[in-house]
A protein has these predicted regions:
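Charged, amphipathic alpha-helical linker segments immediately N-terminal to NTP-binding catalytic cores
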Residues: 1-5
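Short, ordered loop/turn segments at secondary-structure junctions
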Residues: 32-33, 58-60, 120
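Gly/Ser/Thr-rich active-site loops/lids in small-molecule metabolic enzymes
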Residues: 135-142
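Short glycine-/acidic-enriched loop or helix-start segments at secondary-structure transitions
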Residues: 39, 64-66, 124-127
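Residue-level preference for the first positions of well-ordered beta-strands
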Residues: 24-28, 52-54, 84-87, 113-115
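Phosphate-binding/switch loop-helix module in NTP-utilizing enzymes
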Residues: 90-129, 133-134
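N-terminal phosphate/diphosphate-binding loop that engages ATP/GTP or pyrophosphate donors
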Residues: 43-94
């Protein structure tokens, strides 16, 4: 929960309320720590609101057992009908990496909300980004 001080009152808000998340939002999370945890927290809260969530990356993320690593828009669409969220990216050993931008454009609006891990710090406590980091999807909304 987040506390917001408004009109001389402290108001409890969920992360979804605090960020004012709406349908068709694309949310990229970047920084040196807590990206995956933040994405999981957002997804958990959005699922409670009966939203369909697509989780992907523009960098690399540790792969979950249920990650979809097959480049198939129809499979992703089918999985989103069966469950509330889908984790997807290209197979990269123990991790997944970003789909190419063309496929990302095809799948990004399959779900109500898309969550993207947009920056990697390789488990270091801080990072000095270069011109290429973080990679934020061109049609970024939040």
């Amino acid at each position: 929960m987040f506390l917001e001080y408004t009109k001389k009152k402290l108001i409890n808000k969920s992360i979804v309320e605090y960020l004012q998340v709406k349908n068709q939002d694309i949310i990229s999370v970047s920084g040196a720590g807590g990206k995956t945890s933040t994405i999981k927290l957002l997804a958990k809260n959005l699922v409670r609101e009966h939203k369909k969530i697509l989780i992907t990356t523009t960098t690399k993320m540790f792969k979950t057992a249920d990650a979809i690593t097959i480049r198939d828009k129809n499979l992703l669409k089918q999985k989103l009908k069966q469950q509330n969220w889908v984790f997807t990216g290209q197979d990269y050993g123990e991790k997944i990496s970003s789909w190419d931008e063309e496929f990302l454009r095809e799948i990004i609006f399959l779900a109500d909300i898309t969550l993207i891990e947009a920056d990697g710090a390789k488990r270091l406590p801080f990072k000095f980004p270069n011109k290429m980091n973080p990679f934020i999807y061109l049609h970024q909304i939040k």
